[in-house]
Design a protein with these regions (language model features):
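Catalytic cores of nucleotide-sugar-dependent glycosyltransferases that transfer UDP/GDP/TDP-activated
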Residues: 1-703
């Protein structure tokens, strides 16, 4: 495949959220080998970073000409390097200047693609505007650099948060090949989170995606996923199990499966022992107890804090069933780690005091103060199970609710520094499109338990049994919770009973399995997806008129030129019929000059608490006023033009309009101190859907 410039867009570039960050960061060097260090550009969001978070971005002007080309762009762009192995070229997008155009942008996507953004909120708008901004920046790069050099390009967008770039470029730069990759589906993740049906994948064909997306309040995100899957040149996902999900929920079967690689990361016995000791010390600080290193095993579960989807519930349930069994095994004990980032504050003061030798106190279960401990699922389940970490108990649980990135004042180690110290990784996922956490465990030589509901679980099951791979795959599809918990309990006991030599054999098997996941073994799948995307872009390129493939320049506008912005209507050749030239336009009432102040009055909600002003609009057409829920903008647009002309000739009405307009101007230009009233909702007018209950009505009444 000839080298093409590869733009890769993700919300997780320089922004660790979940497994996609690992996917992209771990294969940078393989990508650079194929596209060249200067042919790969990662694009991520310019998001605020809390103080103390490890920096992932370093400013670096790797192309001064590009900086110059983007300096006047409406999208803010930071140029630099992503601080992962390979340090790829990186652009961070600041989409804040697009906020004012949000409705226009979303409206255009609705008109062209049927993208339903009606029920979106800012957790939807912000990523969509980021991706749209990324598309605008790529369009500028295409115009200034790629077209003159006749250079082909590929854009791969990960997840719905990046998909708007594909939609923009389909029109703005159709010769660029596009790949959309979903690492999970929004609707699938939400459906699974209810844990309602153990036959999740078998029952997908009976799901109505639109109905369920609306019921679960993910309709806009689901719509973006569906549209992107439909419109991209190549649609990909990470596993066969997720491909099945995509087919039923998004309406298109993925063209290529892109398994996630990682490779082996074997550690020396000394480093493993050091990591194990750090985990013991952290547990002792948390519980205040002491552990016999020879009789205690360390279990670990890590990942996103998706309580049901990640199998946290069944993990704790199975562990809670072990005390009697452990007591009968010569006093063996287990420490059950749950490394799941949650809303947290500082390390618990009592634990901090213990670390500095100044306090004992009762045992703890969580290393940090939680923002909402009352509603924390792990805390509540531990309470229900009676796990209190009392001294000497066979089962202790330690919840670590932070990102282990080495910046915490108490836990200075990173996740990958601590992971090798675990004896067993336990990942009994209910929903797991791939499953990086068991793969990471295996890569560091830690035996693991996963399930047939994980893409990695299904892949590794095809490589052999537990003794060959180091991984046990539990059945979860079609199995009820109690049976899964019992099976996991039995699997844990079998591991606990293994002689030390057998556990060492499993570690060696893990490393061999991890070697199979080296990115060099999986990049062929990416090459296939990119080949298809380039072919699709090349086919469209042949169909484009030459002026679309020329470096655009701003034409001189005149009434005869037929020019509209950057797009110029070419004159028809002699003997030819000119092609139709279409433009979107809006039909709206033009107010008579005498009534112009009504437009300004309508634009200021001041009229809402002045009944005599509201009556100006009501007198225009009382029936229409009520029908439109007292919406003055809609009224002025929809009332018959003849009625507006009649009112313009009514001297008394015009005088009243002028008087009240002057009153509004005077009242809004007072020099008195201003008061800003902040509230989440306001009940101001029926057509303004900004309230949901009594709080909004109260706020509106105050105004």
């Amino acid at each position: 495949m000839s080298k093409a410039v590869f733009f890769e867009i993700s919300w997780e570039v320089c922004n660790m959220v979940g497994g996609i960050h690992t996917v992209l960061a771990s294969r940078v060097k393989e990508v650079q080998q194929r596209h060249g260090a200067d042919g790969y550009i990662a694009i991520g969001p310019d998001v605020p970073r809390a103080e103390g978070i490890a920096p992932e971005f370093r400013a670096d002007i790797w192309d001064p000409e590009l900086v110059e080309a983007l300096k006047d762009h409406e999208v803010g762009v930071m140029m630099g390097r992503w601080l992962v192995p390979g340090e790829p070229r990186c652009l961070l997008i600041n989409q804040s200047r697009l906020y004012a155009r949000k409705d226009e942008i979303l409206g255009r996507y609705w008109e062209k693609y049927g993208l339903d953004s009606l029920f979106g909120a800012w957790d939807y708008y912000d990523p969509v505007l980021f991706a749209h901004g990324a598309g605008l920046v790529i369009e500028r790069i295409r115009d200034q650099f790629l077209l003159p050099a006749r250079q082909s390009a590929i854009v791969q967008a990960h997840e719905w948060m990046s998909a708007a770039a594909i939609l923009h470029l389909q029109t703005a730069a159709p010769e660029i090949g596009t790949v959309f990759t979903t690492h999970a589906t929004m609707l699938g993740r939400s459906l699974a989170g209810r844990r309602a049906d153990p036959n999740f994948y078998q029952s997908l064909s009976s799901v109505d995606p639109e109905v369920e997306a609306k019921a679960l309040n993910v309709s806009s995100k689901h719509s973006m996923e569906t549209v992107a899957a439909r419109e991209a040149d190549v649609f990909t996902t990470v596993s066969e199990i997720t491909a099945l999900e995509c087919k039923h929920l998004l309406g298109r079967k993925p063209d290529v499966i892109l398994p996630n690689g990682f490779g082996a990361r074997p550690v020396s016995p000394e480093l493993r022992q050091r990591a194990r000791e750090e985990l013991f010390k952290l547990a002792e600080l948390t519980t205040g107890d002491h552990y016999d290193r020879d009789k205690t095993l360390i279990l670990a579960l890590a990942g996103r804090y998706e309580y049901i989807n990640k199998g946290v519930d069944v993990y704790l349930d199975a562990a809670a069933a072990l005390p009697a069994e452990l007591a009968a095994r010569d006093g063996k004990r287990i420490i059950v780690y749950a490394m799941l980032p949650a809303g947290h504050a500082e390390p618990k003061r009592q634990l901090w005091d213990r670390a500095h030798g100044t306090s004992a106190g009762p045992p703890l279960r969580c290393t940090h103060d939680l923002v909402d401990e009352t509603n924390d699922p792990i805390t509540n389940q531990l309470n229900a199970l009676g796990i209190d970490n009392r001294p000497g108990a066979p089962v202790h649980v330690v919840h670590v609710p932070i990102y282990l990135d080495g910046t915490d004042p108490l836990i200075r180690q990173r996740y990958w520094d601590l992971l090798p110290g675990a004896d067993l990784g336990v990942f009994p996922s209910f929903y797991e499109p791939w499953g990086y956490t068991p793969l990471e465990a295996v890569a560091f030589g830690v035996p693991a338990i996963t399930t047939d509901r994980a893409g990695f679980g299904r892949w590794v099951a095809g490589q052999g049994d537990r003794t060959r791979t180091g991984v046990r795959v539990l059945r979860r599809e079609g199995v009820v919770f109690t049976e899964v918990s019992a099976a996991l309990k039995q699997a844990l006991l079998e591991f606990i009973d293994l002689p030390a030599a057998d556990r060492e054999s499993l570690r060696e098997a893990c490393v061999r399995t991890a070697e199979l996941t080296d990115w060099s073994n999986f990049m062929g799948h990416y090459e296939e997806a990119h080949r298809r995307a380039l072919a699709a872009g090349a086919a469209r390129r042949k169909e484009l008129p030459m002026e679309r493939l020329s470096v655009p320049s701003m034409p001189t506008l005149s009434s005869e030129s037929g020019a509209f912005g950057l797009f110029v209507k070419p004159p028809a050749k002699e003997g030819e019929v000119g092609a139709p030239y279409t433009r979107t336009f809006v039909v709206a009432n033009a107010l008579p000059e005498e009534l112009d102040p009504l437009q300004e009055i309508a634009g200021n909600l001041w009229w809402r608490w002045h009944p005599e002003v509201a009556s100006l609009f009501e007198r225009i057409d009382p029936a229409l006023w009520l029908k439109l829920e007292e919406n003055p903008h809609a009224l002025l647009d929809q009332v018959k033009p003849d009625r507006l002309l009649d009112l313009a000739m009514d001297d008394q009405y015009v005088a009243e309009v002028q008087r009240l307009h002057c009153l509004m101007v005077e009242s809004t230009q007072m020099q008195d101190p201003r008061i800003a009233y902040f509230c989440m909702e306001f009940g101001i007018a029926g057509f303004l859907k900004l309230y949901s209950g009594g709080l909004g009505i109260l706020a509106g009444d105050h105004l």
